[in-house]
Amino acid sequence: MFRGVPGVCTAPKRAGSAGMKSPLLYILEVLFCSGLLLAFYRLLLVRKVSFRACRRYLVAAVFLSAVIPALDIPLYPARTVVYPLPLIAAPPAENFVQTTGELPAAGPVVPAGWRRILRPVAVGGYLTAVFLSLGFLAVRMVGIRRLRRRSRLTDCGAYTLAEHPQIATPFSFLRTVFLGGGYEGRRRMIVLCHEAGHVRHRHSAERIAVELVRSLFWFNPFVWIAGRWLQEVHEWEADRGVLDAGYDLTEYRTVIFFTNSSAIIRI
């Protein structure tokens, strides 16, 4: 028979670790992290570092804002917690009574009625928005591919020029520059120089990466803001390439005005 001497159980416990975090907490952390990263970009990086650094930071910020909240990063080192475990004396054999009744089985915890309704509705709405966003992106890419097949292609070395009368606004996608009719002389050269800058810096690949993340985190307004800022950096970098090539600023502004280049990048 044991004498009831208390025992000691030691177990490491890490502060801030409470198991898997809830979806709501993860969403809040995603919003906080993405907002913090974009605030840092706006305050400390815009017009202070190169266009390349701005592009890389914005793309990395979009991915990190989704990855960092998913990590279980401890804020404090693990500490050892001592739990006293009293040893209970065994009862005498003659006082032991055996029960024949069965203990009731523990049933599943049924959530409240509104939770049973709200959870599938929220999941269904989220997945619907994701599939729609990815579907629209796929349709746009398929449309660009079909347009390329119908266009007259010219190998220009660093890029492929696709010309078609139905192209209203010049744009570039991956290694292809799309150009409509009516572009001759220096106007044509300036527009091609602008679009060649997008191809050279692989702007389309960055836009596609951000679009994919935005399709999964469509509820995050900061991802949409990051995409718009990234597009602005792309345009600034392409503009700088045109001016560095020796074209006059006033002439370039005139060409851009009549070309309506605010929509020059579609993807």
Label the predicted regions.
Residues 41, 45, 68, 72, ...:
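Membrane-water interface at transmembrane helix exits
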Residues 46-49, 73, 77, 106-184, ...:
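Juxtamembrane/interface helices at transmembrane-helix boundaries
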Residues 1-35, 45-47, 51-135:
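Hydrophobic membrane-embedded segments
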Residues 190-203, 210, 238-239:
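Active-site recognition of the HExxH zinc-binding catalytic motif
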Residues 20-33, 47, 171-172, 182, ...:
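Membrane-anchoring hydrophobic segments
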Residues 201-231:
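A Zn2+-metalloprotease active-site environment signal
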Residues 74, 201, 225-267:
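Short helix/loop segments within enzyme catalytic domains
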Residues 33, 37, 131-144, 206, ...:
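Alpha-helical transmembrane segments of polytopic integral membrane proteins
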